[in-house]
Amino acid sequence: MKSIAQEHDCLLIDLDGTVFCGRQPTGGAVQSLSQVRSRKLFVTNNASRSADEVAAHLCELGFTATGEDVVTSAQSAAHLLAGQLAPGARVLIVGTEALANEVAAVGLRPVRRFEDRPDAVVQGLSMTTGWSDLAEAALAIRAGALWVAANVDPTLPTERGLLPGNGSMVAALRTATGMDPRVAGKPAPALMTEAVARGDFRAALVVGDRLDTDIEGANAAGLPSLMVLTGVNSAWDAVYAEPVRRPTYIGHDLRSLHQDSKLLAVAPQPGWQIDVGGGAVTVCANGDVDDLEFIDDGLSIVRAVASAVWEARAADLHQRPLRIEAGDERARAALQRWSLMRSDHPVTSVGTQ
């Protein structure tokens, strides 16, 4: 039996919420990634640090990485700008010096003030971004400057919890200018395609925790995806995800990379019988306890219910709400573990919590 990691020659792995939360690795991440023999590329929407700085942070946490293993939204944003502007054009930086350095590396001139007459504005996460930075950017955008956001993640997973992400700052400028930026990072496919282009890869797999960036980005790039439940989105979010945000596989954490892809796939599961009708998805246990435990990593019910809900949604032109119900006590306990028994809840965008 091959593991899902062995089936793919390249893993495009998200960082925040997938590999680590702030300064803490996620469960089993260090050991799991050390055992993966496929090429590992860390693909991050976080534009606050350079590729070398990201690699150094990974090494501090016990991982093995170099700058060549890291693909950042700052790099993607700089490439996007270089394709739109003449060499030497001025770009107002709302973000860190790492972002400014990426802009300079593609032959553009980083500036920080509206008085420098910028041709474009690029915005990435910085913990020190303040009102004055946003004010300079707002003036430039209103004056016609091209506006590029490294990403629009509304939150940033940390060991303290979810903190404001770059998307929260982007929202402030949207409100102030009435304009929308071009987005360089996930879910736009450019970041994924740039990563895959770093080698002759034939079977890449995207691994991440966010439906609205990692998984939607994988789907946009035509790549399979493994959703892990260590960051922003939950099992319930996956069950009710919009089609563009539906993962191919669901696992607990990065230890799932060493499981069989057939176990991880969102599909009907032998341990559960599911009936759909009357606005309800009814789940019953199927088989004896020993057999169920043998094939189940605890998430089989999530994969089974997600498969059933997605199929039901595809067949319902009116997109009516669905209830998830337990047909027996074993199903009830499994559904309650993942908070899936929320009745009469309309299906909406669930990219963030």
From Swiss-Prot:
Keyword vocabulary terms for this entry: Glycerol metabolism, Hydrolase, Magnesium, Metal-binding
Binding positions for Mg(2+) per the UniProt entry: D14, D16, D209
Enzymatic reactions: sn-glycerol 1-phosphate + H2O = glycerol + phosphate
Biological processes per GO annotation: glycerol metabolic process; glycerophospholipid catabolic process
Gene Ontology MF: a single term: manganese ion binding
Domain of life: Bacteria
Pathway of action: Glycerolipid metabolism
Pfam families, alphabetized: GNAT_like, Hydrolase_6, Hydrolase_like
Cofactor binding: number and manner: Although Co(2+) and Mn(2+) support eight- and fourfold higher catalytic efficiency than Mg(2+), respectively, Mg(2+) is likely the physiologically relevant catalytic divalent metal ion.
Free-text domain note: Crystal structures of Rv1692 reveal a unique architecture, a fusion of a predicted haloacid dehalogenase fold with a previously unidentified GCN5-related N-acetyltransferase (GNAT) region. Although not directly involved in acetyl transfer, or regulation of enzymatic activity in vitro, the GNAT region is critical for the solubility of the phosphatase.
Function recorded in the entry: Dephosphorylates D-glycerol 3-phosphate (sn-glycerol 1-phosphate). Is the final enzyme involved in the recycling/catabolism of glycerophospholipid polar heads. To a lesser extent, is also able to act on glycerol 2-phosphate and D-ribulose 5-phosphate, but cannot use D-glyceraldehyde 3-phosphate, dihydroxyacetone-phosphate, UMP or GMP as substrates.
Subunit structure: Homodimer.
Family, per entry: Belongs to the HAD-like hydrolase superfamily.
Name of protein: D-glycerol 3-phosphate phosphatase
Biological source species: Mycobacterium tuberculosis (strain ATCC 25618 / H37Rv)
Lineage: Bacteria, Bacillati, Actinomycetota, Actinomycetes, Mycobacteriales
